[in-house]
Amino acid sequence: ETYHKDRYKVYHPKGMKSIFEWRVNGFDRMGQAGVHKIGMGVLIGLEDWRTDVTMMAIHLQYLRKHYWQTRYSVNFPRMRPSEGHFQPNVIMTDKELAQLIFAFRIFDHDVDISVSTRENAKFRDHIATLGATSISAGSKTDPGGYATYPQALEQFSVSDERTPAEVEQAVKAMG
């Protein structure tokens, strides 16, 4: 979510998730366990995204050095302003997100880059041909969302509401 240790405590003040070192060192535990693919990401909007992404890149380099047999994926989910909910501290534009994806592709040409349904369909369709390696489809964002109805506790809003079949058709149409 963020590599800013002091601010992390603000977002997770209690419980197991509140222990910053436990969260960050979780990637080492996965590597030591021989996990085939490890996904990393920072929640864009909590803190300065350039700092968070730089820290994640350094962390990725460390993990690659120590757990070279593991595959890695990254994502950069953006918080969006929404009435009545937590407001992002920093807003990232579409152009900045595209530049970040391009930069990360240059930084690590083997890393999988995922783009979530938080992004709109037009952006996802374009970025899929320019640097992203996977895009989600048909996502549910509420706890237990695939098993329970109706949606009650949505964690974030989905911008691309296409079904998996519709996303598949869009990808096929791109060639």
Provide a role label for each language-model segment.
Residues 4, 19, 48-49, 93, ...:
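Helix N-cap and loop-to-helix transition residues
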Residues 10-14, 49-52, 86-89:
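Short, solvent-exposed loop/turn segments at secondary-structure boundaries
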Residues 17-19, 44-59, 116-118:
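Active-site glycine- and acidic-residue-rich loops that bind
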Residues 54, 65-175:
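Auxiliary Fe-S-binding modules of radical SAM enzymes
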